[in-house]
């Protein structure tokens, strides 16, 4: 894979252009502020009733309606929730874009699954920082940055890649490294990771471990500590130095037990199910299911949210976290 750094990116490809950042959430505030402080001309596009309008103005940013921001802009970054992007694109973005403009995303869902099909007359690019927005912002203010992915879906002007690199540089990402990929690969790996490992697999593993201990007669508090609370200690070791760092840092007892018992949990049958989940991402079945869920009023999602919030691990967890001064919000 191609990796680019500061010397490979030129902010000149965005200087003198009008840049609209649509949305001012976790990623939106980081993109808007970092680019502004990199010397670029940035406005934020929001709904008139958005609670974020006041926050963006307080940060020194000019705020317009989404339609007006797009009409003004040469480059538009869409940082709105996936499920709202198509409707807003159809009603407020597409009618106000001109040939030669650039449409940018931080995740490829709507482009890859053809919910949004831009005309061939505009650039379509992706710049995806591989960290939450608060870390994108914090590292920038510290003079550093986080790694970013870029992808070029369509180059109408001959400058799409240079603009994507310039955007990543404006975020601070070129100091860490900018990896070139495709919309397809970013979207499919991102969704699979969320479903099979990060949000789905890990949560179900935690609940199953907690339930196993409680059903065997152990106190819920001990089950919570062993299966939920201490997971952060292990994940931090993974994050800092990979599997080897974790194995080096834990006791020999933990290392041996993990290496000999872990494969009994993640069996070939589990991996086969992972492959099925990946296939549903690849062939669009998950995307269709999610879009139908959104259009149907989130009935299944709301039911699942209620079930998860009522799990015993949530009750005991809330009680134990109140004992942890470093977690108690002031």
From Swiss-Prot:
Q: What does this protein do?
A: Involved in the biosynthesis of branched-chain amino acids (BCAA). Catalyzes an alkyl-migration followed by a ketol-acid reduction of (S)-2-acetolactate (S2AL) to yield (R)-2,3-dihydroxy-isovalerate. In the isomerase reaction, S2AL is rearranged via a Mg-dependent methyl migration to produce 3-hydroxy-3-methyl-2-ketobutyrate (HMKB). In the reductase reaction, this 2-ketoacid undergoes a metal-dependent reduction by NADPH to yield (R)-2,3-dihydroxy-isovalerate.
The protein, known as: Ketol-acid reductoisomerase (NADP(+))
User: What residues does Mg(2+) 2 bind to?
Assistant: 190, 226, 230
The protein's UniProt keywords, in alphabetical order, are: Amino-acid biosynthesis, Branched-chain amino acid biosynthesis, Magnesium, Metal-binding, NADP, Oxidoreductase
Q: Which organism is it from?
A: Chlorobium phaeovibrioides (strain DSM 265 / 1930)
Gene it is expressed from: ilvC
Active-site positions on this chain: 107
Q: EC number(s) for this protein?
A: 1.1.1.86
Pfam families xref list:
KARI_C (PF01450), KARI_N (PF07991)
């Amino acid at each position: 894979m191609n990796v680019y750094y500061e010397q490979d990116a030129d902010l000149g490809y965005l200087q003198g252009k009008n840049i609209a950042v649509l949305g001012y959430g976790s990623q939106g505030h980081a993109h808007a502020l970092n680019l502004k402080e990199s010397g670029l001309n940035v406005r934020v596009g929001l709904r008139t009733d958005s609670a974020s309008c006041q926050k963006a103005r307080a940060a020194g940013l000019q705020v317009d309606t989404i339609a007006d921001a797009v009409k003004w802009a040469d480059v538009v970054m869409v940082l709105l929730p996936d499920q709202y992007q198509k409707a807003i694109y159809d009603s407020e973005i597409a009618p106000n874009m001109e040939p030669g403009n650039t449409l940018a995303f931080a995740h490829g869902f709507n482009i890859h699954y053809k919910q949004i099909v831009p005309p061939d007359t505009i650039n379509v690019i992706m710049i995806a920082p591989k960290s939450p927005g608060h870390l994108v912002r914090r590292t920038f203010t510290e003079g550093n940055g986080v790694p970013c992915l870029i992808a070029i879906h369509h180059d109408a002007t001959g400058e799409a890649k240079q603009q994507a690199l310039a955007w990543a540089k404006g975020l601070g990402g070129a100091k860490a490294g900018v990896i070139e990929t495709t919309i397809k690969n970013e979207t499919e790996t991102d969704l699979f990771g969320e479903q099979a490992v990060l949000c789905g697999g890990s949560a179900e593993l935690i609940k199953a471990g907690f339930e196993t201990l409680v059903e065997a007669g152990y106190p819920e508090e001990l089950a919570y500590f062993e299966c939920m609370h201490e997971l952060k200690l292990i994940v931090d070791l993974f994050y800092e130095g990979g599997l080897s760092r974790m194995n080096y840092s834990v006791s020999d007892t933990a290392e041996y037990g993990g290496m000999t018992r872990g494969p009994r949990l993640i069996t070939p049958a589990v991996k086969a199910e992972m492959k099925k989940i990946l296939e549903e991402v690849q062939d669009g079945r998950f995307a269709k299911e999610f879009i139908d869920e959104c259009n149907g009023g989130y009935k299944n999602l709301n039911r699942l949210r209620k079930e998860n919030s009522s799990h015993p691990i949530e009750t005991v967890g809330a009680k134990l976290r109140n004992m942890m001064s470093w977690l108690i919000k002031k």
